[in-house]
């Protein structure tokens, strides 16, 4: 039997993921971003074990990262038959991902303030 070690999320990582969630990021996406920010690369199986997410949750969350071009994906052939293993790594530095959410929230805030200003104008007009 082979033995391997997998990095797991600690309390600080979970706090980071929760902070992402407070910005409106889906739970599994936040956990996936946090996990990948802490490793050079990881297989789907490593991510499942280290983040405590199930395979379908990893796949769905990975789609969101792929849609934003934040993750690279490569297939690694294992010896023998069967499907190749997928290995993922963050393509975009974590500070740029944070900047994306910062800009998104600033834009939302500006739109909200615009609506409030319009309400003020309508009520006084």
Residue ranges and their predicted role:
Residues 1-23, 78-79:
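N-terminal leader segment of winged-helix/HTH proteins
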Residues 69:
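Glycine-centered, phosphate/nucleic-acid-interacting loop/turn motifs that mediate DNA/RNA or nucleotide
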